[in-house]
């Protein structure tokens, strides 16, 4: 598999495209919010010769799903997926956008509701395991590739930080507990691909993230 990333919208959301060797791919958090950004995504996929099979949202906040409508209109056969616990957010995406001054097309309801332990498979070698880590939102998920030693974490964790928990459905204790039990138990050299900002690693966050309970001091 190959992991690509593009940065979209004023919130600088990382949109990830994970491609199997045969070109089938999954689009994670399409965040393109303007015609120019939509063209960037469409042209990137065309230039790489990719064929989108999945659209997966790590969570239902509008900045991460603002491109869902465009993706579903462009690739009509794409399968859409998210965690059911964020459905209430996704059903009100246009209202979320209005609060922040954005016009957001209401995306289709996810066709597949993912849960902890599920897998997303595509092409001849695309395989991502799902972990449910609520706290930033009730239905936040991360997608892990053991083979590639990478995990896409949405807004669950960032470099030396974690996702905010003051939005509807947020829960700080749940977030930290999930990070400790499901992310910090991954191999230390696992690359962490967040929803905003630069890449990090499990080892780096264990050493330097001030929000983790069992932070290493050596």
Annotate each language-model stretch with its function.
Residues 6, 114, 133:
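Hydrophobic residues at beta-strand termini and immediately following loops
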Residues 10-12, 114, 137-138:
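Short acidic/glycine-enriched loop/turn segments that link adjacent beta-strands
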Residues 32-126, 207-215:
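Active-site HxH/HxHxD metal-binding segment of metal-dependent hydrolases
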């Amino acid at each position: 598999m190959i992991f690509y990333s593009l940065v979209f919208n004023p919130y600088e959301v990382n949109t990830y495209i994970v491609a199997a060797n045969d070109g089938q791919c999954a689009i994670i958090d399409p965040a393109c919010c303007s015609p120019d950004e939509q063209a960037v995504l469409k042209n990137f996929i065309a230039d790489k010769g990719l064929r989108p099979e999945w659209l997966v949202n790590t969570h239902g906040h509008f900045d991460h799903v603002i491109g869902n409508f465009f993706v579903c209109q462009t690739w009509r056969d794409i399968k859409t997926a998210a965690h059911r616990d964020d459905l209430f957010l996704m059903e009100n995406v246009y209202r979320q956008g209005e609060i922040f001054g954005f016009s957001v097309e209401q995306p289709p309801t996810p066709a597949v509701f993912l849960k902890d332990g599920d897998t997303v498979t595509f092409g001849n070698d695309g395989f991502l395991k799902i972990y449910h880590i609520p706290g930033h939102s009730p239905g936040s998920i991360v997608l892990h590739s053991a083979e590639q030693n990478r995990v896409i974490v949405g807004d669950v964790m960032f470099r030396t930080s974690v996702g905010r928990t003051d939005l509807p459905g947020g829960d700080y204790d749940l977030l930290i507990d999930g990070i400790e039990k499901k992310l910090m138990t991954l191999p230390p050299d696992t690359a962490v691909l967040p929803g905003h900002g630069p890449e990090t690693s499990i080892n780096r966050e264990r050493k330097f993230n001030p929000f983790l309970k069992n932070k290493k001091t050596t």
